[in-house]
């Protein structure tokens, strides 16, 4: 019984256990199913999210690729346009070169035609000369002389016709200038102050009656004065004042002193003019010497040869591009000395070289060569050292500097010249033209003096009367005018006047 109860109990327990176990298994299965469904949903959601992100990334990548493609397209378009522009420019250059080649070919063709014409002209001329020589062989001396005279007359007539044309054109130009005078008044008002300090001097008179005495009977006094001094004496309506005009300051100053002495003395006639002129020349020499001594005193340069001091004084009356050469030399000496002092170099030698660096300008209108070459020769002649000579030669680069002081002098020269307002180009060009005119006239044989006057519109040439007759004087005037025309550029018409004067002097005792 007990065994049966135990068996029943066991069976019941087994049944209950089975039921409970089955229930638990079913519960676990349901939970597993729920978990599987949940995981499946979660996986689906994650898959959707991954898909969405992949789509977004794909779209971004596509957009980025599109942008890169657009940028590449723009770059290629830009390169294409640049290439097209370069091609167009090359085409333009090629086109211009073709035009230039065409023009050169045309010019060459014209030149060839001109050469052919010149060749034919030469052949014709040779033929004419052969005929003339054949003809002259059977002529007398008088007949040949007459032919030469006729040809010379024809040549002069041709030159006169050209001169007439130039004079006419000059008058038309002057008329046009006068028409513009009102417009240019403001500019012209500055001209006397700008140029007056260099090219003109005024002399005050006690009264206007003195003007008549200065002119003299039939103008003999004024003619004598201008001939002796080489300066224009301008007498106009300005009350109690006459004007002296010359580009050469030394001549002008001597003329001023001469005229002041004549006015003070009151006796004005040719002999008195010559006497006062000689006195004024002596006075001028004294002024030149004093100016040179003052320059050496201001700069502290000692031991200069007396002739060098005299040449320094002459620089007071010379200008370079409107700058006073003596003032410029003093300025260069002081600037160079200051720089030498800062660098611990030889101050005295530098100052001496700076003062003498333009000494050649005192004679460059009288001696052939550049002012540096002339200055070096002068310094050598009067015992200056090789260093000083090198400073003179090297300040314009004509010789290499051999010492640092030479470099300082060149630098100081450039500083002084480059200072605002120190120099003027147009005046120097004008003066060089006048000096060149005088040199051309002086290059002819038997010429005593030559003066460029009337602002460079006239050259007066004084010849030796014993060696030149009237016919030769006419010929010389023509030849000088021709040479100036060929070698000098000048506005308007230039007049050449050759003066031949013979004086006979006797004394009654």
From Swiss-Prot:
Q: Which UniProt keywords apply?
A: Cell membrane, Endonuclease, Hydrolase, Membrane, Nuclease, RNA-binding, Transmembrane, Transmembrane helix
Give the EC class as a word.
hydrolase
Q: Would the keyword Nuclease be found if you checked this record's keyword annotation?
A: yes
Q: Name one GO cellular component term.
A: plasma membrane
The HD domain extends over 325-418
Q: Does the keyword Protein biosynthesis apply?
A: no
CDD domains for the chain: HDc (cd00077), KH-I_RNaseY (cd22431)
User: Where, subcellularly, is it found?
Assistant: Cell membrane
Q: How does it sit in the membrane?
A: Single-pass membrane protein
Please provide an example of a Pfam family that matches this protein in its UniProt record.
Answer: HD
Q: Which family does it belong to?
A: Belongs to the RNase Y family.
Which function does this protein serve? Endoribonuclease that initiates mRNA decay.
**Name of the protein this chain belongs to:** Ribonuclease Y
Q: Which organism is it from?
A: Pseudothermotoga lettingae (strain ATCC BAA-301 / DSM 14385 / NBRC 107922 / TMO)
């Amino acid at each position: 019984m007990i065994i049966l109860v135990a068996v029943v109990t066991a069976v019941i327990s087994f049944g209950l256990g089975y039921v409970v176990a089955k229930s638990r298994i079913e519960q676990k299965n349901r939970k597993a199913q729920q978990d599987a469904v949940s995981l499946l949903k979660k996986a689906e959601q994650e898959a959707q999210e991954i898909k969405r992100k992949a789509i977004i990334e794909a779209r971004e990548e596509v957009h980025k690729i599109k942008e890169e493609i657009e940028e590449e397209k723009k770059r290629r378009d830009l390169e294409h346009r640049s290439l097209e522009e370069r091609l167009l420019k090359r085409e333009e250059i090629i086109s211009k070169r073709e035009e230039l080649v065409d023009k050169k070919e045309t010019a060459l063709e014209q030149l060839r035609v001109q050469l052919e014409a010149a060749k034919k002209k030469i052949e014709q001329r040779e033929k004419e000369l052969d005929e003339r020589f054949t003809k002259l062989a059977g002529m007398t001396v008088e007949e040949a002389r007459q032919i030469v005279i006729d040809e010379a007359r024809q040549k002069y007539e041709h030159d006169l016709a050209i001169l007439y044309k130039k004079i006419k054109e000059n008058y038309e130009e002057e008329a046009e200038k006068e028409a513009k005078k009102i417009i240019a008044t403001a500019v012209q008002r500055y001209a006397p102050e700008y140029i007056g300090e260099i090219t003109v001097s005024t002399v005050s008179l006690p009264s206007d009656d003195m003007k008549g005495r200065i002119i003299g009977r039939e103008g003999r006094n004024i003619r004598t004065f201008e001939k002796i001094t080489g300066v224009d004496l301008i007498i106009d309506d300005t009350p109690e004042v006459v004007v002296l005009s010359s580009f050469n300051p030394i001549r002008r100053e001597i003329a001023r002193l001469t005229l002041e002495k004549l006015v003070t003395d009151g006796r004005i006639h040719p002999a008195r003019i010559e006497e006062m002129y000689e006195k004024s020349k002596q006075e001028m020499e004294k002024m030149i010497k004093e100016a040179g001594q003052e320059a050496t005193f201001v700069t502290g340069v000692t031991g200069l040869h007396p002739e060098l001091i005299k040449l320094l004084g002459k620089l007071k009356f010379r200008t370079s591009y409107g700058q006073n050469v003596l003032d410029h030399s003093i300025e260069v000496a002081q600037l160079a000395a200051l720089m030498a002092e800062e660098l611990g170099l030889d101050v005295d030698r530098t100052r001496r070289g700076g003062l003498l660096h333009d000494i050649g300008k005192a004679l460059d209108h009288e001696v052939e060569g550049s002012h540096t070459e002339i200055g070096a020769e002068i310094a050598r002649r009067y015992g200056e050292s090789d260093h000083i000579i090198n400073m003179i030669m090297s300040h314009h680069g004509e010789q290499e500097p051999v010492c640092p002081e030479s470099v300082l002098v060149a630098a100081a020269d450039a500083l002084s010249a480059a200072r605002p307002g120190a120099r003027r180009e147009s005046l120097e060009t004008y003066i060089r033209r006048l000096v060149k005119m005088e040199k051309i006239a002086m290059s002819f044989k038997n010429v005593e003096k030559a003066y460029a006057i009337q602002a460079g519109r006239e050259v007066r040439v004084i010849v030796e009367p014993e060696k030149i007759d009237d016919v030769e004087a006419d010929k010389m005037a023509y030849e000088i005018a021709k040479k100036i025309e060929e070698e000098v550029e000048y506005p308007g018409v230039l007049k050449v006047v050759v003066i031949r004067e013979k004086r006979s002097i006797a004394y009654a005792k």
